[in-house]
């Protein structure tokens, strides 16, 4: 049985330092996976800095449990928040706070045999100060159970 794994992932994508100067400094993630960070899909890699510590365990044969906690901050305070694929969903409007929010993610996978497997993924987004200060804000929960049959 595999040993437990502890990991960390970090992402940095540029934001626009000076709005209205005729130059766009915001990273453009062409063809990005909407759920690149979590099922919550509240942001995309444009003007985002994030850190994701994670932990994976294999308690029994065929069962994998993966957990992560992600911290999201705007890279540049003068730029807003973007959602997939790259829509500006919240303008900066002079707000200096950078904390967008945190996401707790959980994935439980169980492979019964080489043909049948089950997967349960969930994520819980906790709104940060920028979300709260820039408009409507609420925490969001997503869950996606799946069963796969390969032949």
Functional labels for PLM-detected ranges:
Residues 1, 8, 53-57, 106-110, ...:
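Residues on the lipid-exposed face of transmembrane beta-strands in outer-membrane beta-barrel proteins
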Residues 2, 47-51, 100-104, 137-143:
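Residues that define the transmembrane beta-barrel architecture of outer-membrane proteins
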Residues 3-6, 62-65, 110, 114-120:
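Repeated loop/turn-to-beta-strand initiation elements of outer-membrane beta-barrel proteins
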Residues 8-12, 67-71, 120-124:
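Transmembrane beta-barrel strands of outer-membrane/channel proteins
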Residues 18-26, 78-84, 130-137:
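Outer-membrane beta-barrel translocator domains and adjoining extracellular loop/strand segments
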Residues 38-41, 90-94, 129-135:
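Extracellular loop and loop/strand-boundary signature of outer-membrane beta-barrel proteins
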Residues 78-105:
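Outer membrane beta-barrel transmembrane domains
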Residues 113-146, 150:
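Predominantly the C-terminal beta-signal and adjacent terminal strand-loop region
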């Amino acid at each position: 049985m595999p040993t437990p794994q502890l990991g960390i992932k970090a992402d940095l994508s540029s934001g626009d330092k000076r709005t209205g100067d005729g130059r766009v400094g915001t990273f453009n993630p062409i063809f990005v996976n909407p759920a690149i960070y979590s099922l919550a899909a509240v942001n995309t890699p444009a003007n985002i800095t994030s850190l994701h510590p994670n932990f994976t365990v294999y308690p029994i044969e065929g069962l994998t449990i993966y957990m992560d906690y992600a911290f999201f901050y705007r890279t540049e305070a003068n730029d807003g928040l973007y959602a997939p694929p790259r829509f500006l969903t919240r303008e900066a409007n002079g707000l200096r706070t950078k904390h967008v929010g945190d996401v707790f993610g959980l994935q439980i996978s169980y492979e019964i045999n080489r043909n049948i497997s089950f997967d349960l993924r969930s994520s819980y987004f906790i709104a940060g100060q920028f979300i709260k200060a820039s408009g409507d804000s609420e925490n969001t929960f997503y869950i996606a159970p799946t069963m796969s049959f390969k032949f």
